[in-house]
Amino acid sequence: MSNPLNGGRRGRHRRRLSATALALGVPLAGVSYFMFTPEDSQAATVDSGAYYRLVSVRSGKVLDVNGFSTADGTRIQQWTDQNTANQQWRLKSTGDGYYELVNRNSGKVLGIAGDSTGQAAAAEQQTDRSSASQQWRIGDVSGSDAVTFTSRKSGQVLDVTGNSMDQGAQIIQWPGWGGANQQWKLVKVADSGGAQTGSGSYVWRNAPVAGGGYVTGLVFNQKEKGLLYARTDMGGAYRWDTGAEQWTPLTDWVGQKDWNLLGIESLATDPVDPDRLYLAAGTYTNDWAGNGAILRSTDRGRTFQRTDLPFKLGGNEDGRGAGERLVIDPANHDTLLLGTRKNGLWRSTDHGQTWNQVSSFPVKNGASFGTGISFVTYGPAGSNTIYVGVADRSTNLYRSTDGGNTWQAVSGQPTGQVPQHGVLSGDGSLYLTYSNAPGPNGVTAGSVWKYNTSGGAWKNISPSQGGYGFAGLAVDPQKPSTVMVTTLDRWWPQDEVYRSTDGGATWKTQSDRSVRDASIAPYLGTGIGHWMTALSIDPFDSGHVMYGTGNGIWASKDANATDNGGTSHWFIGARGLEETAYYDAVSPPGAAALITSLGDQGGFVYDDLTKEPTGRLTNPEIYNSTSVDYAQSTPSLVVRVGRGGKQDGALSTDGGHTWNGFKGEPVPSADSGRIAIAADGSSFVWTEAGQAPYRSTDRGASWSKVNGLGNDAVVVADRSSASTFYSLNNGTLYASTDGGANFTARAGNLPGGKLSAVPGVAGDLWLAGDGTGLLHSTDGGRSFTKLSSVESASAVGFGKAAPGTSYQALYLIGTVKGVAGVFRSTDEGAGWVRINDDAHQWGNFAGQRIVTGDPDTYGRVYIGTNGRGLQYGDPS
C-alpha cells in the first residue's frame, strides 16, 4: 500500500559522526550505550539488557505482535499500549551498527516477510536467521527523542501503513520520508511487582495437543473476511489468526477467583463494527458457582471490559452446544439479546454495558429440561423479527415481529423435541435442528425442520432417522439453499455430516465423500468425530467449512467439492486451541522432556515441545490417566494409572514411549488414584480411589496391602533413598523405610496439602499447605519449618539449579506478598520471583496442583491447567 503523504520526500537534517562516537567503538552487551551510525551522531541511549516499548510518534500506539502469538509469520501491528510481553522488545546488537528487535513474548525477531526489498512488504515475527531483513539501523530524528529503524536489506524504514491511526494497522517497510508514522519513541519497561524480588519475565507456550476438548461454537464475522471465533465449554474463547493459521487464546487473563468465566456460553461478533466482540461467560449454574458476566471488547478480544450479570450461565452444562444465545441486532448494533438457562431473555441497548430482562418474553425459567433458551436469531436488518428457541417439549419456538415488544408461539411447530440451532437463510427459510434431549450426551432421537417464514408452512427435512439426534447447523450466506447439518450421539457406526444444495430436499453424506488428514493431531485419527454441535460456513468462501467436536475442530477449504460429485478434503483445524485438563505431569532427567496424564485423552510423551505428539500413551490406553511417576535414579522406568481403558495401570521401561499393562491390580473393582515408584524402581505403591494403598515389588504382577495407612492415603517416594516412602494423611506425616511395606507416624499437627520430595536429596520434603503456606523438612518429615514469605501454596515443584547454585530451583503455585501466581526461587525459598503475569493466569489452574521444573533446562517450568492445556514457561 502506498503512503498517501509520499508525494514529495521530506529529507531529515543529518549530522556528522562525532569524534566522541568514533571513539566509543562497538557497544558492549549488557551495558548502557549510545547507538550510532555513519550518518547519525548519537541516537537513543539504550540499555541492551532491558526491554522497550516502541511507541509510534504519529498514533501513540505501540509495536505489537498480533494476539500474543509465538508463531513465525505473525503480523506486526500497532496497538494500544498494554505493556504486555508481546509489546516489549530488546534491541540486540549485531556488532556492526545494526540491531535485531527481539520480542519478549516469543523470543523471535522482527523481520520482513519473504526477505523482500519491495515497498509495503509486511513486517512479521520470525525465527532469528541472522538475515539482513531482520537487522535494523537505528537513527535519531533531529530535534526529537524519537528514532527510525532502517532495514539493512532494503534501506527502507519501519512504517505504519497509510499513516494510519487505527488499532491493528499493519507495520510495513517504506522509503523514509520523515513522517511521524515512521518515527518511534523508546520507552523502557520497568519490571516491578509487589511479589517480585527480581526480574521474572517469562514466555509461555502450550505443550501442543491441538484440541483435546469440546468446541461448542464457531462464529464467523459477517463483514470482515477471515475473522472467526471459537468458544469452548471450559477453556475460554479463541480468535483465528489467518496469517499464522492457528488459534489465539483470548481469555488466559482470567484469574483464579474468576475461574467460572472460562466456560463460554455464547459469543457474538459485530456485523457492523468487526472490532467489537462479546462473550457470555459462565461455566456452571450451581449454587457454589459465581454469576455469569458479559465480557465486552472493542479490539477483537485483546482487552475486555466486564459487566456482571445477576444470574448464572452454564457454559459447561447440558445444552452447551446449542446456540447462539447471544446475538447482535443487525439494524442497531448497540442492541444485543441474551437467552439464558433459567432467567429468560435479556436485552442491552448500550453495547452490553447494562442489561434488563425482556419482561414480555413468556419463558422465564429453565423450561422442560432446565436449560432454558437454546438460541436467539434476528431476521433481516430492519424487519424487527426475532426468533427464540426454547428447550421445551411442548412450545419450543417463539417469534416477535416488533423488535421484542410482544411474542407469539410459532404455529404448527414440531413438539416432543428441543431445538439445538436455528438459522435463517437468505431466502427467508428458517432451518432448525432438534434432539430429544439438550445433549451433548443422552440423545436418542431428533429431526431437521424447515419453516417457511412468509407462508407459515413446516416441513420435516431430516436426512435420516435413527436412535440419534441432530445438532450442528449452517446455511451458506452466499447460497441460501445450501445447508449442512450434523448428527448427535450416533455412536454406531459414527456420527455424520450431511450437505444439501436444494434446501433440504436431498442430502449427501460427507464422511464417504471426503479425505481426512489428521497429521496435525495424529492421536485423533481420521474418524469424523463426535459431539459435532458447532458447524459454520465461511460467509466469504463457500468451500471453507469448520465444525467442532468433543476433541477439537475439523476444517475444509473445498467442502463444496461434493456438490458436483467430487471429494472434499478435511484437516484438523485446532492448532493453537488447547483445551485439555491435567491430572499430573513429570519431566524425567535426561529422558523425554515431558510425560503427562490427563482427562479424556489419557496422556502424551513429548520429546519435542514444539510438536504435537504422534499418539496417546497406549497398550493400554487409559483415557482418564490420574497419576504418573518415574524412578529418580532410573528415569526410563515410568508408571501410570487411571481409568477408562482395558487396564488401569501400566509400566514403561523406555521413558514413556512404549508401555505394558500391569499383570495384576490391587482391587479389581477399583481404579484411578495415585501411584509412586521407588527411586530405583524396585517397588510401586498404588492407592486406588477409595482404597488403602497397595505395594508391588514385581512390577505390578502382584500387590499386597500396605500397613499403617488408611484409605485414600497418597504416597510419595523419596527421590534419593530407594527404600523410603512418605504419606501425608489427616495432618500426620508417615514414613516407610522398607520399600513401602510398613508406615509409621513421624510428625503431627500438619496442614493438609500436597507433599513433594526433592530429587537427589534424601529426606528433603516440601509441603504445599494450601492456605497455611509452604513448609520445608530436611529430616525426612520429622520436623517442618514454615516459610514466612509464602502466604498460601497449592503445589511446589523442582527443576535444574540456577547457574552458580547447587540446590534445585523451586517453582511455586501460590501467593507471595499478596500476589497469586507462579513463582520461582533460586535460594531455597528465601526470595521469590513471580514468573507468570496478568495476561497468563489460566483460571483455576492452582486447583490442579501441577507444577514441575525441567531437570535439564534451568528456568523451564511446566504447569497443568484445567481446560487450557499444559503450559510451559521459559525465561525471556
What is each stretch, according to the model?
Residues S2-A43, V189-S876:
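Extracellular glycan-interacting surfaces
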